[in-house]
Curated annotation (Swiss-Prot):
Cofactor: Mg(2+)
Annotated residues for binding of Mg(2+): 102, 241, 243, 245
Protein name: Phosphoglucosamine mutase
PROSITE patterns tied to this protein: PGM_PMM
Main function: Catalyzes the conversion of glucosamine-6-phosphate to glucosamine-1-phosphate.
Domain of life: Bacteria
């Protein structure tokens, strides 16, 4: 298949007001998507968004395009990405559309699609939408125009779904939990889920104003959560990103618990309960400590390319059910069709309650190796990954690690960045090597 013009690894994303995230582009995208998706039968599309101020503008443009193509839009209002996937399935809709730029700042936004099964759209459907966008908009006859409606109980439906992934014989009674919703799409969902399961909940990041999403809070900035967990003497802290498809956690000592550790805890509990089917999938960025800890448990481990869509592809290829990225995207195919921060967190809380153990103690079976990640912004036509000097410095670093570490260079799928990752047993050496390689990349 030829390279896609607009769709990246996670839909279409960019700065609001700049191509492609403009009202006219999104209207045309809605029409093109409507024309392609209408061929499959259903006439309804679910549309959700996070809390960015630009969401109002973009959902209106999408609705106009879809209506012109003869499809009706059902709006959820602010809703986590995995909730839109769930509602798309339960409503038997033709597709779901999420307006979000996930963990990015408020002045970015994006559009991503879910199939009727609640999974990412196949590449060939995205390609068909791009091809349709090259054609002019030709509105259907007036009698065939789409309508717009609102799903008034969308939040309640998803809250009950999330609670259903927590064992009915258990409760969170006695647990004090601080939850950081990043002023994003989980702000009216996650605290209620935890409270209704019995926890004492302290909520932060639950006052979205359209411009404070992900700002010094949420899964990408844990400082506020760590401070609050310690101040409140809470048992655990949970942090989601702006659209709720990823999670980070904090133990009662204020220590960060990342996606690799969360994956380990869920896999180990699944093994103990006889529920784990096959192995688990991580990514090229997953810490070696995860691989070693799973090996000790006899759990097979496979690495996918970075990106939740690639984790999902590897799970399907292997016939396995559990995978995650260290950034906190956790996919539990026995419960969901896509990464779901709230559901993933509930599985860790299940392990805490069932084993009467703190999050800190549960994590003691896995030792993370020191890992340094340096992001280097690049521009221009030259490819730093093909540069002879960068290759030479990388090869030298691998020799210095003596087989007891890893070096990984890769391009970001969503930003003009080269990510330089080095891990190994010696933190000082790892830091030195990562910065040396980053300097070589900057010099290109």
């Amino acid at each position: 298949m030829s390279e896609r013009k607009y769709f990246g690894t996670d839909g279409i994303r960019g700065k609001v007001g700049e191509s492609p995230i403009t009202p006219d582009f999104v209207l045309k995208l809605g029409f093109a998507a409507g024309k392609v998706l209408a061929r499959h039968g259903s006439k309804q599309i679910i549309i959700g968004k996070d809390t960015r101020i630009s969401g109002y503008m973009l959902e209106s443009a999408l609705e106009a395009g879809l209506a012109a193509a003869g499809l009706s839009a059902a709006f959820t209002g602010p809703m986590p990405t995995p909730a839109v996937a769930y509602l798309t399935r339960t409503f038997r809709a033709e597709a779901g559309i999420v307006i979000s730029a996930s963990h990015n700042p408020f002045d970015d936004n994006g559009i991503k699609f879910f199939s009727t099964e609640g999974t990412k759209l196949p590449d060939d459907v995205e390609a068909a939408i791009e091809a349709e966008m090259e054609k002019p908009i030709t509105c259907v006859e007036s009698a065939a125009l789409g309508r717009a409606s609102r799903i008034v109980d969308a939040a309640g439906r998803y809250i009950e779904f999330c609670k259903g992934t927590f064992p009915s014989q258990l409760s969170l009674n006695g647990l004090k939990i601080v939850v950081d919703c990043a002023n994003g799409a989980t702000y009216h969902i996650a605290p209620n889920v935890l409270r209704e399961l019995g926890a004492t909940v302290i909520s932060i990041g639950v006052q979205p104003d359209g411009m404070n999403i992900n700002k010094e809070c949420g899964a990408t900035d844990l400082r506020l959560l760590q401070e609050r967990v310690l101040a409140e003497k809470a048992d655990v802290g949970l942090a989601y990103d702006g659209d709720g498809d990823r999670i980070m956690m904090v133990d009662h000592l204020g220590h960060k618990v990342d996606g690799d550790q969360i994956l380990y805890l869920i896999a180990r509990e699944g093994l103990r309960q006889g529920e784990l089917r096959g192995g688990v999938v991580g990514t090229l960025m997953s810490n070696m400590g995860l691989e070693l800890a799973l090996k000790q448990l006899g759990i097979p481990f496979a690495r996918a390319k970075v990106g939740d869509r690639y984790v999902l592809e590897k799970l399907k290829e292997k016939g396995w059910r559990l995978g995650a990225e260290n950034s906190g995207h956790v996919i539990l195919l026995d419960k969901t069709t896509t990464g779901d921060g709230i559901v993933a967190g509930l599985q860790v809380l299940t392990a805490m309650v069932r084993n009467h153990m703190s999050l800190h103690d549960l994590c003691s079976g896995m030792k993370l190796l020191p890992q340094i990640l340096v992001n280097v912004r690049f521009s221009g036509s030259s490819d730093p990954l093909e540069d002879a000097r960068v290759k030479a410095v990388t090869a030298e670093a691998e020799i210095e690690l003596k087989g007891r570490g890893r070096v990984l260079l890769r391009k970001s799928g969503t930003e003009p960045l080269i990510r330089v990752m080095v891990e190994g047993e010696d933190e000082a050496l790892v830091s030195t090597l990562a910065n040396r390689i980053a300097d070589a990349v900057k010099a290109v």
